[in-house]
Each structure stands twice: as structure tokens, then as C-alpha cells.
Amino acid sequence: MGDSTTAGTPGFLSPLEAPPDGRGDVESQYAYWMMKLHPEWLVLNRGINGQRSDEIRERLERDVLREGCDYAIILAGVNDLYQGRTLDSIEENLVAMHKRSIRAGIRTIAATVLPYNTMSQADYKSLAALNQWIRRVSHIMGTLFCDTSATVSDPDDPTKLASSPDGLHPDPSGYRKMGEALARVIEESQVRDFTE
């Protein structure tokens, strides 16, 4: 559940953007790589390019809760920051999506928001604060957590993506890293569930 980073921009249009199956390079979405690792999984791409957290929250019922999912990846907030929305408003929307999903019996994964290469230092400071909050609140709420930002950020400059075709989104290798990291989080949670 998310924005362009979930949809697979710029290489792929999600099924919500280009019904019924999406269009473009299927490798340009983390959902593809999760299913490549686990063919037994059905990972629904519910990303829409350009959406803010409030817009994503509005479609949670339709796009996640009615699908009967076991897990929901919630990755949102970069467009809010880009448009000058407050951290408080983003946090409120993220908490609401996690709470609503958990009440519906869905395990949620709180994913950190990715940087983009043209971010100002002030924007990056807000992004870093949001990602610290996401990590902290996932622990408090008992959700799963994935540091998706760390998987695709330049190790020498975390304000930028390591590899990007447009400076705003990961390339297929970045989406692959995201998919692998998210799959690992689910795998580990399933092992814990089995051993408890």
C-alpha cells in the first residue's frame, strides 16, 4: 500500500494505474521481487503515483482490507513532505492505517520512506525524523518493520538513492533490494510464529 515507490515508478504502472494487470517493466516494482522469491505468495501492488498519506488512507478499505490479506506493507509520506505537509499529519495517517489493518486481523509492516536526489537538507531532516518515528512507533504498536530506505540509499550519501533512472525512484535493482528486504521481514515473522 503506497505511492509511486510501491507502484514501481518510473518503469511500471501499477494495476490500479493501468488495469487490470499494470503495464511496463514488471521488475520495476518490489511486489514482483517478493513473488520471485516466494512463488507461493500473491503480492498485490496497491501503489498510486503521487499520492499523499491521506489519499492512501482513504483507499485502505477498498485496496487492502477487502482483499483479505495476511500482511500489509504501509509505505507512505514522501509526497506529503514534498508538498510541505506536517510530520504530525503524516504520522496520524500512518497510525490510522496500521490500527485499522490490525483490527481487521492483518499484520502490518511499517516501511521507511525513501529519499530523492533533489531533496534539500531541510527536507532530508524531515525525512530522517519521519523514518526515526516510523521505526519507534512500529516497536510501540508491535508492527513489523523494514528499513526500505536503507536498502536503496547511497551508502556514502543517505540523502540520495544509490541507483535511480530519474533521481526520484529506485531502478529495478533497487526495487529488487526492497523486495528482498520486505520478504525477509515476513519470513522472519513466520519463523517466529512457528517457533512460539
Where are the predicted features?
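Serine-esterase "nucleophile elbow" of acetyl-processing enzymes
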Residues: M1-R46, L60-G68
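Alpha-helical cap/lid subdomain in secreted, periplasmic
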Residues: S28-P39, R52-E196
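Short, flexible loop segments at the rims of nucleotide/cofactor-binding pockets, characterized by
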Residues: D21-R23, I48-R52, D123
